[in-house]
Amino acid sequence: METEVNVAEISALDYEGRGVTKVGGKTVFIKGALPSERVGFRIVRQKKQFDEAEAVAIFKVSDERTVPQCRYFERCGGCSLQHISPAAQVAFKQRMMEEQLERIGKVKPKQILLPIYGHVWHYRDRARFSVSLDKLCRLKLGFQAKKTNDVVDISSCMLLPKPVSDKLSAIRGLLQDLAEEGSVARFAEFYRGSEITVLNIAFKSKLRQNEENRIRQWFDSELSDGWQVWLQIEGGVSQPFYPKTDKTLKYTLPEFGIEMPFRPGDFTQINTDTNRLMVSRVVKMLDIRRGERIADLFCGLGNFSLPMAKSGADVVGIEGAENLVRRARQNARLNGCDRQTDFIAANLFDCTEKTVASWERFDKMLIDPPRSGAYEVVKSLHTPYLPQKIVYVSCNPSTLARDAGVLVEKGYMLSQAGIMNMFAQTSHTESVAVFDLLPQTGKNFLKIKGKD
């Protein structure tokens, strides 16, 4: 690859947080460069449509540049924006959302919401660590390096709660000992709840008795009563291992008086504090009237369903996995809102107009899909089953933009949109959008409803 150093002005950031410039008419994405900066860079990868490069010198520094706090930042793939000030990170994500909506969806929000800010350090309540062994059987524990599958061995992480970060070296030591005895962990992960922190370790095969004893001894010397070790064997379901405890892995939504038990492997938001703010905003956006029938699509464990029910709605949560549906029902009973909720197992990626009709009409709808979005759902919505309001929570601005374009074509107005800084120091963007059914579309609905 080229060793020559080129110099250019940076015009923008791409969706990964890389600086963008053009050289000889060809776009170049430069890691470590910011808009308005003049940088020296070296090409590291050439492609037909664009080149990728790394900044090697900065001749004009942006006011938005800051010093990364983590010593692993240059190599670790866990973060990509530590060199950008927190306020500039939020502004970048806001611009990215607006640009995607306009470019992909051909839509523009009537109102841009103020961002939801969260903590910028030590905010992660769960994380999975990769594990690898080198030829000398030395174990690495950490996150994968940028653009590769190599594991960056870390002894601390600025995004983790300090009590977890402080234990990384001890966890590595345990996994090293087990590897030398013949049991190499596939991965290790932690989950922090309101009562307890769980260390979940996955192995390809069942541990021997001496290895289990080694974990118990290690726990007693390294961890405290606020922890518990779980094991996942042969790709099965994780199970509590040591010690026995009455404490439950759960998170809380205090505004709604909700406790949400969960298990390792369940999807939960990684940032509990920002999740609380997000749930509160979404419930306010829905403007719930008592007795309204509201759908919660991709409902998971009921993160939105239960607060909506507590706010007076009759909620139907729809989720693809039967086990999650069962757990959502349990959570509803636990929180005293099972009479206001119903949960259905359905593959929303196979959604059709017939599927939508089978649900009957909802007054309002919440959509909270994975990164791939909810295209099959939004394209299947049709009169007379169009809800008056849709709130769409997204972790991928490009699929939000695509689906927003479909909803506007179906007679909705994109009333509001904004971001929530759920993933500080990374380029991942959590956003929310509100779609209101236009009056003319509503009249069409009323006419058809009257004929029925």
Curated annotation (Swiss-Prot):
Record key words, sorted: 4Fe-4S, Iron, Iron-sulfur, Metal-binding, Methyltransferase, rRNA processing, S-adenosyl-L-methionine, Transferase
Residues annotated to bind [4Fe-4S] cluster: 70, 76, 79, 157
Superkingdom assignment: Bacteria
Active site: 395 (nucleophile)
Biological process terms in GO annotation: rRNA base methylation
Residues forming coiled coils: none
Binding site for S-adenosyl-L-methionine: 269, 298, 303, 319, 347, 368
PROSITE patterns recorded: SAM_MT_RNA_M5U (PS51687), TRAM (PS50926), TRMA_1 (PS01230)
Annotated catalysed reactions: uridine(1939) in 23S rRNA + S-adenosyl-L-methionine = 5-methyluridine(1939) in 23S rRNA + S-adenosyl-L-homocysteine + H(+)
The name this protein goes by in its record: 23S rRNA (uracil(1939)-C(5))-methyltransferase RlmD
Source organism: Neisseria lactamica (strain 020-06)
Gene giving rise to this polypeptide: rlmD
